[in-house]
Amino acid sequence: RGLVGSEMCIRDSINRLNFWLFQYFFVLLPYQSVRFNRKRKFIMKIIVSEEIESVCPTFVGACVEANVVNTPYCQELWDEIHALGEKYKETLTTESLKEMSGIAATRKVYRACGKDPSRYRPASEALIRRMLQGKELYQRDTLVDLVNLASIAYGYSIGGFDADKFEGDTLTLGVGKAGEPYEGIGRGMINIEGLPVYRDKTGGVGTPTSDNERTKMSIDTTHLMVLINGYDGDEQHVRENAEYIIELLKKYCQSDGGSYFIYK
């Protein structure tokens, strides 16, 4: 009887082990894989409103998404920023930079929407202007610095976001309304009436002048979304800017670069 009882205990143990192995390999692991892939393949739907189409019918944007590792500082990235700054000092002035295609087109859209582009400068113009004045760009963290480099390199105003902070699954590009609440990063509440603005389910998240505190990137950001605003309608240039960002992410943010798509 003792031998039979021992055999039964062994069988029970084997059955339990088989049960848990089955749960692990055929239930838990596939679930974890699906959950990871859903996050990695997450893509927001982006709608360009009739408001924007009416003032800029040739608008073309690019959305870059990637899994990333952010760091406080990257010397190699800043070497690239400084090199580009020196190049611009030799080739541009604070007036001629306004003629860069992406900047000129964004300023034109501002005027069409009723906003003074000299008071609310597009971010790309403000960054390059600061360089030309001999001022150092503000250093934040690697993701912020990288997006700034991509913006000044191509002249487009680019929004960088922590994609996990968006509400809902759709972003709509429209025009800011009077009294619409919007907290710019490091700027407090700003007046976005007449500014092109991306909105999620909750409200505004990004304009060509300033992105919103609510969805900003941080040192803990692992899921990045970047929006390139091509108000000049140059799709090839916008694509090149997106591919440039992907290469920077591979070099400086331990990323495989993610992917991008064009929207109009």
Model regions and ranges:
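Single conserved hydrophobic/aromatic residue that forms the stacking wall/gate
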Residues: 1-12
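Generic short amphipathic/hydrophobic targeting helices enriched at N-termini
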Residues: 4, 30, 39-43
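A detector of low-complexity, intrinsically disordered, Ser/Thr/Gly/Pro/Ala-rich segments
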Residues: 12, 16, 41-42
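Short, positively charged and aromatic/hydrophobic N-terminal segments
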Residues: 14, 28-31, 35
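Charge-biased, low-complexity intrinsically disordered regions
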Residues: 42-264
